Swiss-Prot record:
It comes from Arabidopsis thaliana (Mouse-ear cress). It comes from the Eukaryota. Bifunctional enzyme. Involved in de novo dTMP biosynthesis. Key enzyme in folate metabolism. Can play two different roles depending on the source of dihydrofolate: de novo synthesis of tetrahydrofolate or recycling of the dihydrofolate released as one of the end products of the TS catalyzed reaction. Catalyzes an essential reaction for de novo glycine and purine synthesis, DNA precursor synthesis, and for the conversion of dUMP to dTMP. GO terms for cellular component: mitochondrion. Residues 281-565 are annotated as: Thymidylate synthase. GO terms for biological process: 10-formyltetrahydrofolate biosynthetic process; dTMP biosynthetic process; methylation; one-carbon metabolic process. This is Bifunctional dihydrofolate reductase-thymidylate synthase 2. PROSITE patterns: DHFR_1, DHFR_2, THYMIDYLATE_SYNTHASE. GO terms for molecular function: dihydrofolate reductase activity; thymidylate synthase activity. Residues 245-280 are annotated as: Hinge. The gene is THY-2. Residues 65-242 form the DHFR domain. The lineage of its organism: Eukaryota, Viridiplantae, Streptophyta, Embryophyta, Tracheophyta. Heterodimer or homodimer. It catalyses: (6S)-5,6,7,8-tetrahydrofolate + NADP(+) = 7,8-dihydrofolate + NADPH + H(+); dUMP + (6R)-5,10-methylene-5,6,7,8-tetrahydrofolate = 7,8-dihydrofolate + dTMP.
Length: 565
């Protein structure tokens, strides 16, 4: 920035500013609209008057923060010969919508760019309308004195200082750094960078300008769009948010096996543009719960508790960047993992889970419950031919939870893996827990009953049908469980996770869950965590709980809800 040195060293800072000529007071060359000069002078005169009256003491510099907006290839290439080496109209529209979006209609955003980036914008489009354009240049020959809504500065720091102080702090809502290469290399991953909005281009493209990768020890994905194909390129929009001030230090280990980065969750709603904040996928769940509570059908149910119900619902989660473990309340991650591994093992013995401190099946495995449904000869803890048995021994005759069923029935899970590996275009990659001939032997007929898998673009996706969904207690578990299953199968089959589509028949809220769910609805979401799977394990039957590491799970507190049995 072409900054002019302030030589009035002995006066209070605000008083010095009021005495200096206008162009020096903001330390940059800028060209305001004539209509804005009145407001600028009002700010300056007010500052001087309050300082003289002893009402203003400027002891510290305002905090200067910003967000980065960039499109990059997998190799983090962003340009070739000073131009974008791709033509993506959808990306340009996203950039425009993002940088124009404000929550206060009286304010605008600022876009910070290097001189070469400014010059690469066609003249008819510059300055970028509806935004304050801040151009960084140290060249004495660069002059935009007659251009409205443009400020020139010599560095990012000086530009941020300018924008964080009056008068700009009163009219600028958010600051976006948009390029070019040198500017982004300096700005990306700095502690003052609160969010990174990156258009991730899957295709390798010849570039000569590159930027660093996103520091995943300091940032977590907030949201990521499903892949878009345009002009032969596949890309997606991902926003990463800063969850700690630097990459130094270790995340804390939680008792459930997750790793937590210290997240200041309160800031996200104010930091992120609303169009980005609202894209958090947890809102798929929260909005469905809200809709059921507000407009659900009042129905009786098997347990006698009573429900509010809606029929025919769908949620679609993107597994490519993060893992959909709900954050508006704490979900029992260790329970999710151990139960899924229990399913995979084919076990029907609830005591196996009990011994690990997992008691989610206790209600349906108790002596009183089994007697109540007519299974009086069944040993306590024996759930009958439920999920795992159907996955691994479909069609086998069930005796009890102690029998060895090796080689009996049809192993649907191994069949799914074989088809994914050897016939990925098969439309019959299906696993069903619904076996009508065995329903009368089950402690509880399967709720999540049918899963189909789909392979495309090196990704594995899963669509699961759930006939009955307890939105308060069950669904958060179900989302995590089938997302984890999809991630495990992708890992075993050398693919990457794609989508998890959750289709629900009867989606219901129990009457005694309404109040705790309303409490949960008051909690804003936090970033979803990231899942890491032990790369050494490739056999579906070899996994243990320690093979799954959850990074950055920092949910709101646990919310108790009583299980309807």
């Amino acid at each position: 920035m072409r900054c002019l040195q302030n030589s009035a060293k002995t006066l209070p800072l605000a008083f010095k500013s009021a005495l200096l000529p206008l162009s020096q007071r903001w330390f940059c060359k800028f060209s305001p609209k004539p209509s804005s000069l009145t407001n600028i002078f009002k700010v300056s005169i007010s500052t001087m008057a309050n300082t003289l009256n002893g009402n203003v003491i400027m002891t510290s510099k305002p905090q200067s923060t910003y967000q980065v907006v960039v499109a990059a290839t997998k190799e983090m290439g962003i340009g070739k010969d000073g131009k974008l080496p791709w033509n993506l109209p959808t990306d340009l529209k996203f950039f425009k919508d993002l940088t124009l979006s404000t929550s206060d209609s009286a304010k605008k955003n600022a876009v910070v760019m290097g001189r070469k980036t400014w010059e690469s914008i066609p003249k008819k489009y510059r300055p970028l309308s509806g935004r304050l354009n801040v151009v960084l240049s140290r060249s004495s020959g660069f002059d935009i004195a007659n251009t409205e809504n443009v400020v020139t500065c010599s560095s990012i720091d000086s530009a941020l200082d300018l924008l964080a102080a009056p008068p700009f702090s009163l009219s600028i809502e958010k600051v976006f750094v948009i390029g070019g290469g040198d500017i982004l290399r300096e700005a990306l991953n700095k502690p003052s960078c609160e969010a990174i909005h990156i258009t991730e281009i899957d295709t390798s493209i010849d570039c000569d300008t590159f930027i660093p990768t996103v520091d995943t020890s300091a940032y977590q994905p907030w949201c990521s769009s499903f892949p878009i194909c345009e002009n032969g390129l596949r890309f997606s929009f991902t926003t990463h948010v800063r969850v700690k001030s630097s990459s130094a230090g270790e995340a804390s280990d939680e008792s459930d096996g997750s790793k937590v980065l210290q997240v200041d969750w309160k800031k996200f709603s104010s930091v992120l543009p609303k169009m980005i904040f609202d894209r958090h996928e947890e809102y798929l769940y929260l909005n469905l719960v809200k809709e059921i509570i507000s407009n659900g059908n009042l129905k009786d149910d098997r347990t006698g508790t009573g429900t509010l119900s809606k029929f025919g619902c769908q949620m679609k989660f993107n597994l490519r960047r993060n893992f959909p473990l709900l954050t508006t309340k704490r979900v029992f991650w260790r329970g999710v993992v151990e139960e899924l591994l229990w399913f995979i093992s084919g076990s029907t013995n609830a005591k196996v889970l009990q011994e690990k401190g997992i008691r989610i099946w206790d209600g349906n495995a108790s002596r009183a419950y089994l007697d109540g449904i007519g299974l009086t000869e069944r040993e306590e803890g024996d759930l009958g031919p439920v999920y795992g048995f159907q996955w691994r021994h479909f069609g086998a005759k069930y005796t009890d939870m102690h029998a060895d069923y090796t080689g009996q029935g049809f192993d649907q899970l191994l069949d799914v893996i074989n088809k994914i590996k050897n016939n990925p275009d098969d439309r019959r990659i299906i696993m069903s827990a619904w076996n009508p001939s065995d329903l009368k032997l089950m402690a509880l007929p399967p709720c999540h009953m049918f899963a189909q898998f789909y392979v495309a673009n090196g990704e594995l996706s899963c669509q699961m049908y759930q006939r009955s969904a307890d939105m308060g207690l069950g669904v958060p578990f179900n989302i995590a469980s089938y997302s984890l299953l999809t991630c495990i199968l992708a890992h075993v089959c050398d693919l990457v996770p794609g989508d998890f589509i959750h289709v629900i028949g009867d989606a219901h809220v129990y009457k005694n869950h309404v109040r705790p769910l309303q409490e949960q609805l008051e909690n804003p979401p936090k970033p979803f965590p990231v899942l890491k799977i032990n790369p050494e394990k490739k056999d579906i039957d070899s996994f243990v709980a320690d093979d799954f590491e959850l990074i950055g799970y920092d949910p709101h507190k646990k919310i108790d809800m009583k299980m309807a049995v």
